[in-house]
Design a protein with these regions (language model features):
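Low-complexity, glycine- and small/polar-enriched segments
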Residues: 1-503
Length: 503
């Protein structure tokens, strides 16, 4: 039969607070600077492992898997009565989520079965929602709406790991009969993180005198890692896969408010450190009769969108839409490895997903007289993709193809637009993109010679797809106004391939 070592964890956290018109039935009457405030946090650790053990399933499969699914939700519904206060936050929403998921075989362990899976999967959804008051609010100073959704801000961030330890051995020895019964060896770590911060549509609220809207998501550090550090053999295929996916959305759909003069409202996404890596450790042995694939992938989708009032902002008001993204994708093949595909292909890849897309949109419009300010759309993007092969090893696919590649894909779009239907002292839209991309493949740098053999061998570093578009447009209906639009793209690409000591 089959052997399963499985750990499943579902985590849910929520915080809701509402005004006297809220369906939740919570009445908020205290005016203490936090009229509507909601917080939700979640943190979890989930591990499935075999340590110094022997698992043998001669006629079945062996599966070691850890799966965590978490949802964190905070909602604040502003009170539906008149407020008059000098300094206060009408809505303050905060969420945070951190989880650690690991599946591994370590110590002097031996796992043998027709099919072997070592799988770690962590899925997290984080949502923060804040609604503005439904009646008149008079503010002299201070922010009106603050909505923050964060994840992976803990000490270690969001961790997802699947690996075979240095002294462990794993064997998949099944015979594939058809496409539905493929007996392979798979080590896979997959992380999915979705973060959303939003202010729902606030059309026709009336003469609100709000300060600013600050709506933002923050992904701290994700660490997704798959590795074989010991010995792995398969009569079919071997897969070592790490996939890290982040989706961020910050959205202010529409607000109709005569904003306090000088207010800068902002929708912002930040990915502080996204990491996906695959490692074949020093001295590791991988042998497959079929294909061997070691692949690290990052996927990043981030959208910020903000639109100011159809009825106009105050003097020198502005709206900003901003994305700050840092991602790293890496493949590390250690020293003195022995990787052999008897009759198949070997694919060693560090790759950014082609469907990744980052977008900042800021829209300003007004039917009233105002002066100064304008929309700004900005993207700050830093990406590193590396594939590194160490010294003194042997990589052999003599009857198939051998690929060692680092591949980057970039799709950035910033759009700022303002339409002024009446006289404006100035009307300026700005769109800025700053992009830094580094793609590097290195083979046997500064050390003993590595043997590389394939019927067809490709070693390279590539930017396969790069779309960078910054667009700014300003329109003023009346004469006598200063109308400006600025769009800039600063792009720095560094692509290199080095084969120092290989044959």
């Amino acid at each position: 039969g089959s052997i399963t070592v499985e750990s499943v964890l579902n985590v849910n956290a929520s915080g809701v607070i509402g005004g006297n018109s809220a369906k939740k039935g919570v009445s908020v009457s205290g005016i203490d600077g936090k009229a509507s405030s909601a917080t939700a946090k979640a943190e979890s650790v989930n591990i499935a492992y075999v340590n110094n053990g022997v698992l043998e399933a001669a006629r079945g499969k062996a599966s070691i898997s850890a799966n965590t699914s978490s949802k964190t939700d905070a909602q604040a519904l502003a009170p539906n009565f008149s407020l008059s206060l000098a300094e206060m936050n009408i809505v303050n929403v905060y969420t945070d989520s951190n989880d650690s998921v690991e599946a591994y075989v370590t110590g002097a362990s031996r796992v043998s079965a027709l099919k072997v899976d070592i799988l770690a999967n962590g899925t997290a959804e984080v949502t923060a929602t804040g609604a503005v008051p439904g009646v008149t609010v008079s503010l002299v100073n201070g922010n009106a709406v603050i909505v923050t959704a964060t994840a992976a801000k803990g000490t270690n961030g969001k961790v997802t790991k699947a690996y075979v330890g240095r002294d462990s051995e794993v064997y998949a020895n099944g015979v594939t009969e058809n496409e539905n019964t493929v007996h392979s060896l798979k080590v896979s770590a997959e992380s999915n993180l979705t973060i959303t911060a939003k202010v729902p549509e606030t059309k026709s609220i009336g003469a609100l005198k709000l300060g600013v809207f600050l709506v933002k998501t923050i992904a701290g550090k994700t660490d997704t890692w798959a590795a074989i550090l010991g010995k792995a053999e398969s009569t079919n295929d071997i897969f070592v896969l790490a996939t890290d996916k982040i989706t961020e959305t910050s959205n202010v759909e529409l607000f109709s408010a005569g904003l306090v003069a000088g207010g800068a409202s902002r929708a912002e996404n930040t990915v502080e450190s996204q990491n996906s890596s695959v490692q074949i450790g020093d001295g590791a042995v991988l042998k497959a009769w079929g294909n061997i694939q070691a692949q690290a992938v990052t996927k990043t989708n981030a959208q910020t969108q903000i639109q100011d009032a159809a009825y106009g902002g105050g003097t020198n008001c502005s709206v900003e839409s901003k994305n700050n993204i840092t991602r790293k994708t890496s493949l590390v093949i250690g020293n003195n490895v022995n990787i052999t595909s008897v009759i198949g292909n070997i694919e060693l890849l560090a790759e950014e997903d082609k469907t990744s897309h980052i977008e900042s949109i800021a829209t300003g419009s007004s039917g009233s007289v105002y002066a100064g300010g304008g929309p700004k759309a900005e993207i700050n993007y830093n990406s590193t993709v590396t594939a590194t092969v160490g010294n003194g090893g042997n990589i052999d696919a003599r009857y198939g193809t051998l690929d060692i590649k680092a591949i980057a894909n970039t799709d950035l779009y910033a759009d700022a637009y303002r339409k002024a239907a009446a006289a404006a002292g100035s009307n300026k839209s700005e769109a800025n993109i700053n992009s830094n991309v580094t793609v590097v493949t290195n083979i046997s740098k500064n050390g003993a010679k590595t043997r590389i053999l394939g019927e067809v061998t490709t070693i390279g570093a590539y930017i396969e797809n790069q779309v960078i578009l910054a667009k700014a447009k300003s329109y003023t209906a009346s004469a006598g106004s200063k109308t400006e639009a600025y769009a800039t793209s600063n792009v720095n690409n560094n692509v290199s391939t080095g084969v120092d000591n290989a044959w």
